[in-house]
């Protein structure tokens, strides 16, 4: 490594710091939850994606322990060698049934799943049409596919249709977050499906933040989308599900094609079987989780009522557990986040380039594990500081 290369890194790091864009990894001790120990201090956390409070649920912990005793720690091989365990298959079967699709495939992460699906189904002769606010993994997947990459303005279906109509690609795929992670708004699934049918395109929906929460826990698909063979559905499993990984659900022929051709699936060691055991229990808890979801929605309503009318910040329009409080400048968002932390409330600032310039925000996320008092404390403290 040359001194010049390292010097360029030093200059780049200094520039990130000067622009209030340098990031750090807060250090968690103990289990995830509404109240956590971060960097040695006890705080109320409003920044995890553990929407149903399942990450430390005793039933999931017990399921993982039982599988650990019976299966050990690691899978030991890729799925197509000797790492595909009975527990993986049982979870895939249960997941497909729960979300209303014929078949499913388990991946180690959502990022990996997105790379696998897009690159396996779209070639260099294809075209990917993506909402401008999609998750970074969908952007990277489209770029790695080698296909033409067309991004349309957030939620602008007219622009999407004009680009579909102009496309001469052999294969087309519309890709979209289902719940957008930085704004909390929800994609118009049936309208996207209309366009996919009209222009003979796949519709790939990343439901990282809707699965377990929307539609009784089954996620953001409409009944029509569940029945469509052109709709491919992704749920990540480290958020509302409380564990780790991701699962893709689709027509059985799509899933078999991914097994045979998706390089991120083929050339990756399988996830530990104990995670699949915990995920099966998570599905049971999600299915029986009406009370958790009801409590979560009450928290959303209380927060939105309590933080309406702030002078120097505004809540984005969202009915999901993602409640972005838009502040504006990076420095202002950091200042508010740090002031809340001094009061024992953890809500990190989200800055450029994750969100557009001048829309830095506190990304408040709510959980069924929060108490009414936790939410009231957040509302009161934001009013004092914002």
Swiss-Prot record:
Cross-referenced NCBIfam families: bioF
UniProt family annotation: Belongs to the class-II pyridoxal-phosphate-dependent aminotransferase family. BioF subfamily.
Species per Swiss-Prot/TrEMBL record: Thiobacillus denitrificans (strain ATCC 25259 / T1)
Top EC category: transferase
Official protein name in the record: 8-amino-7-oxononanoate synthase
Associated pathway: Cofactor biosynthesis; biotin biosynthesis
Residues the record lists as N6-(pyridoxal phosphate)lysine modifications: 239
One GO biological process term: biotin biosynthetic process
Sample GO molecular function, one term: 8-amino-7-oxononanoate synthase activity
EC number(s) from the headed UniProt entry: 2.3.1.47
């Amino acid at each position: 490594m040359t001194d010049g290369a390292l010097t360029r890194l030093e200059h780049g790091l200094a520039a990130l710091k000067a622009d209030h864009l340098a990031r750090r990894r807060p250090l968690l001790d103990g289990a995830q939850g509404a109240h956590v120990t971060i960097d040695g201090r006890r705080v109320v956390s409003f920044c995890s994606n553990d929407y149903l409070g399942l990450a430390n649920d005793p039933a999931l912990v017990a399921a993982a322990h039982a599988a650990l005793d019976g299966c050990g720690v690691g899978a030991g091989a890729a799925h197509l060698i000797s790492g595909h365990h009975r527990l993986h298959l049982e979870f895939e079967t249960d997941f497909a049934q729960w979300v209303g699709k014929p078949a499913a495939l388990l991946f180690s992460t959502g990022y990996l799943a997105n790379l696998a699906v897009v690159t396996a189904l779209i070639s260099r002769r294809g075209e990917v049409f993506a909402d401008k606010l999609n998750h970074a993994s969908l952007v990277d997947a489209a770029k790695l596919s080698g296909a033409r990459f067309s991004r349309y303005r957030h939620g602008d279906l007219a622009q999407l249709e004009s680009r579909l109509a102009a496309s001469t690609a052999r294969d087309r795929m519309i890709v979209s977050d289902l719940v957008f992670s930085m704004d909390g708004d929800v994609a118009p699934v049936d309208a996207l499906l209309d366009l996919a049918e009209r222009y003979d395109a796949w519709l790939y929906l990343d439901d990282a933040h809707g699965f377990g929460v929307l539609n009784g826990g089954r996620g953001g698909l409409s009944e029509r989308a569940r029945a469509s063979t052109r709709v491919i559905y992704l749920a990540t499993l480290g958020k509302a599900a409380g564990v780790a990984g991701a699962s893709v659900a689709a027509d059985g022929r799509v899933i078999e094609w991914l097994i045979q051709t998706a390089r991120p699936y083929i050339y990756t060691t399988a996830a530990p079987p104990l995670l699949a055991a915990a995920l099966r229990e998570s599905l049971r808890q999600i299915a029986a989780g009406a009370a958790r979801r009801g409590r979560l929605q009450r928290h959303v309503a209380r927060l939105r009522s309590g933080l309406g009318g702030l002078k120097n910040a505004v809540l984005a329009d969202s009915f999901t557990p993602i409640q972005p409080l838009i502040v504006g400048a990076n420095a202002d968002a950091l200042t508010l986040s740090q002031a809340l932390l001094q009061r024992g409330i953890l809500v990190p600032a989200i800055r450029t380039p994750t969100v557009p310039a001048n829309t830095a925000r506190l990304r408040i996320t709510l959980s069924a594990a929060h108490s009414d008092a936790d939410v009231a404390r957040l509302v009161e403290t934001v009013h004092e500081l914002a």
